[in-house]
Every structure is written in structure tokens, then in C-alpha cells.
A protein has these predicted regions:
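Alpha-helical transmembrane segments at the extracellular/periplasmic loop-to-helix junctions
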Residues: 268-276
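Membrane-interfacial entry segments at the cytosolic side of transmembrane helices
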Residues: 1, 194-197, 235-245, 269-270
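Loop-to-helix entry region of an early transmembrane alpha helix in multi-pass inner-membrane enzymes
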Residues: 80-99, 107-129, 162-170
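Membrane-embedded helix bundles of polyisoprenyl
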Residues: 72, 119-134, 143-190, 195-231, ...
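Start-transfer (signal-anchor) and selected internal transmembrane alpha helices
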Residues: 1-35, 125, 136-137, 144-145
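Extracytoplasmic catalytic/substrate-binding loops of multi-pass membrane glycan-assembly enzymes
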Residues: 21-34, 40-54, 63-76, 88-100
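Hydrophobic core of alpha-helical transmembrane segments in multi-pass integral membrane proteins
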Residues: 8-15, 248-254, 276
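Sec/Tat-exported extracytoplasmic proteins
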Residues: 58-63, 107, 126, 133
Length: 276
């Protein structure tokens, strides 16, 4: 009965997070002279146009590198000149956010602004439920419900995930907690098959997180957390090594390379700064 009530409350918390953003959306619709332009909702963040423009280029089947060329002129042209390459960027080098906006725009008459804003309540629901699930895995069911409610409605998160805030912040926190929860679950669960299955799922969501956020550096603290949990839970060495390999594999080779590359760059810059 306890776990069922916690799961029901988790769903309710997610729906409350959805409702708060949806209520805000209804207020926007009542004030279209301020919040809409040409029957399309506006943005309330400076980062929004960057992602909307990428979605626009994808929607029009244009090269996203053309958008980057304009945004980073003339540095981008110089970089292309050095590489002597005009190849289109890999789809994985484009945030999953504009890709998602472009996909869902087909349900809203190709209105990218409308599609982007409609994703916000859904993202709030996912984030609230992810935070709650993390605490449930820790063993704090009802406390997790309170944490999910408090986090989704707290001022700092609410402002950054409100209507008009088309940014990767919409899912960054939710994906972060979801991955940590899956990593922890892969340690706590009994049976090697379940352990390996959960760590593979964690790696896959880390792959999505990296694709969404375009900053692969979070892989390192995730692996560090996994190793610490394995150590303190006295897990067998063989299964521990397999878990680490599977997590890295499902996170994506480019994510792994990018994470350690970022770490090397950070260390070099720190040493350079410290030597001055």
C-alpha cells in the first residue's frame, strides 16, 4: 500500500507541475497583445532564439552550419578554413531541444514558437517526477514527494522553466536526477542481470542528456558516483567493471571522449592561470 500511495502522489506532483505551467500559458493567452506576435507566443529568455533558429533551419531542411556561420562570424569562417571542410555538423552536435521542437511543430501547423512553449508543461511534469523517483530509490518515498513538489514549484526552478523559457534548463535537472537515480538503483537492486540492465538504461539517458545539453562533462561525476557506490556497497569487482564499461558504452563514445577532453582543457587552463 505504501509504495502504491507514493507512486500515486508522484503522479499527482507531476500533474501539478504540469498544471502550474499550463495555467501560466492560459494567462499568456488572455494577454495576447503583450505575449503574442502574429498569433505566435513570444519568448522570455535570451537563449530561446538560438534554439528556435536551429529548429527553423531543421524545419526548412537547411544546413544548421549556416546558422552557426552567421552567429559566430567571422570566427566560424576561420575555423572552417582551417579544417578545409564544409561538411554538415553531425545531428548529435545539434541539441536535442531544437530537434524536438521541429518534430512537434508538425502537430501545431509548423508553428515553432507554439510547439516550443507547449513542450514546457510536459518538461515540468518529467522533471518533478524524476526528482521524486530519485528520492524513492534512496528509500525516502514520502520525502521524495515533498522534494518533487518543492523543487518543481521553487522560485529558482519555476522561473527558469516557465512559459517562454525555451532553453535546455527545461530538462537539465530532471535528466540529472533521473540518471543518478538509475545509477543508484543499479547498485541497490539484487541480481546481476537487473544491475546490468539498469546501468545500461542509465547510460542511455546520459547519452540523451549529453545530446540535449551539449556538455558531456557530467559523465565524469556520474562515473565517480558509480565507483563510490560500488566501493561502499562492497560490490564484486567483476560486475563493477562490467557496469562501468556498459555505462560508458551506452553514454556514447563521443560523449566519453568529449568529457575527458573537456577535463584536460580545464586542467590546462587552470594550470596556466595558476602559473601567472
Amino acid at each position: 500500500i505504501g509504495i502504491i500511495s507514493v507512486l500515486i502522489l508522484t503522479l499527482i506532483i507531476g500533474l501539478l507541475a504540469f498544471k502550474t505551467r499550463n495555467d501560466q500559458w492560459n494567462v499568456w493567452k488572455l494577454n495576447k497583445d503583450i505575449t503574442f506576435y502574429n498569433n505566435s507566443p513570444l519568448l522570455s529568455t535570451a537563449d530561446g532564439p538560438y534554439f528556435l533558429n536551429q529548429a527553423k533551419y531543421l524545419n526548412q531542411n537547411k544546413s544548421v552550419s549556416l546558422h552557426l556561420e552567421k552567429r559566430f562570424f567571422p570566427e566560424y569562417d576561420k575555423e572552417i578554413g582551417k579544417n578545409n571542410s564544409n561538411d554538415e555538423d553531425s545531428i548529435f552536435n545539434i541539441s536535442l531541444l531544437p530537434i524536438t521542437i521541429n518534430y512537434f511543430s508538425s502537430f501545431f501547423n509548423n508553428d515553432l514558437l507554439l510547439a516550443a512553449n507547449k513542450l514546457i508543461p510536459i518538461s515540468a511534469l518529467i522533471t518533478a517526477m524524476s526528482i521524486t523517483v530519485f528520492f524513492i530509490i534512496l528509500g525516502f518515498g514520502y520525502e521524495g514527494v515533498v522534494a518533487g513538489l518543492g523543487a518543481s514549484l521553487s522560485q529558482s526552478i519555476y522561473v527558469r522553466t516557465s512559459v517562454g523559457r525555451v532553453d535546455t534548463d527545461l530538462l537539465n535537472i530532471g535528466l540529472f536526477y533521473l540518471i543518478l537515480g538509475l545509477v543508484l538503483a543499479s547498485i541497490k537492486v539484487e541480481g546481476n542481470k537487473k544491475k546490468l540492465t539498469l546501468i545500461c538504461i542509465a547510460g542511455f539517458f546520459n547519452f540523451l542528456f549529453t545530446w540535449w545539453y551539449q556538455h558531456p562533462g557530467f559523465l565524469i561525476p556520474f562515473v565517480f558516483t558509480l565507483v563510490l557506490l560500488q566501493f561502499f556497497n562492497r560490490q564484486k569487482l567483476k560486475i563493477s567493471i562490467i557496469q562501468i564499461i556498459l555505462f560508458l558504452l551506452f553514454s556514447g563514445p563521443f560523449s566519453v571522449i568529449g568529457s575527458f577532453s573537456n577535463l584536460v582543457i580545464f586542467v590546462n587552463e587552470f594550470l596556466l592561470f595558476a602559473s601567472r
